[in-house]
Amino acid sequence: MRRGPTGWEPPGRLEGERAWGQRKAQSILGWLRLSEPRHGISPTEGIVLLPQPDGTSAPLEIVLLAKVSTGFPGVVQLLEWRELPNDILMVMERPERSQDLKHFIRARGFLPEEVARELFHQVLEAVRHCTSCGVLHRDIKPENILVDLATGQAKLIDFGCGTYLQDTAYIHFAGTRSYSPPEWTHFGWYYGKPATIWSLGILLHQMVCGEHPFRTGKKISWDHQLSLPQRLSQAGALGRTLRAWSHPRKEKESLEKLY
């Protein structure tokens, strides 16, 4: 069983502990209504139905999650789904004691390199797994990463913005605007893997610095020069990667190796 580093448990009350809010269920199960509004999309607009081999149809989010979740620990497991008269119900695993990464970071201010390295590696493995299955998550951010506080296992959740991975450019954006790549901001298109690499760089910055690099009025662009804390080890992999990402036009060269 995986165990987290010393200090894995956050102090005091677990803000953001994953009870799934109104979605809570018993034991290790969590449930989610797909009709709940998200990302400013109305309930009915947010559900894309795909035809299935048996002649029925299924929501895209469920199809994508079914492709990537079975047997892989780094993605939340879809256990069952049901179509109700006015809702679609998803039943997923829910670690008994867990917290999303946003609140996991907030409880500490920032993550020590050892903890950040372990969690970031797990997220990378989950992203690699998804892309190998032909799935693009499109909304990688701390809120969509669940940390099992008992084992230290990170799980990628919420495929509501996901789609199939393609070699051609995407001309419709789905996800969180503050994680969108510069090419979308400047040109209105983006490619799946480079956009994922960009959001992973932002995620890593949040983990080791405790804040979003573009939340202080900085415009999302290639010409981003961000100051990094001196506590980051000069020889460490995270420090090298983040320093390359935080200087103009170097992030592709350094982060594309993640794939």
Can you say where each PLM-predicted feature lies in the sequence?
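Conserved end of the kinase activation segment
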Residues: 184-194
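AlphaC helix of the protein kinase catalytic domain
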Residues: 100-110
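Short beta-strand micro-motifs within the conserved protein kinase catalytic domain, predominantly
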Residues: 77-88
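Conserved C-terminal C-lobe helix
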Residues: 231-245
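Activation segment signature within eukaryotic-like protein kinase domains
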Residues: 119-120
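Conserved activation segment of eukaryotic-like protein kinases, specifically the C-terminal portion
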Residues: 171-184
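Catalytic-loop of the protein kinase fold
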Residues: 131-148
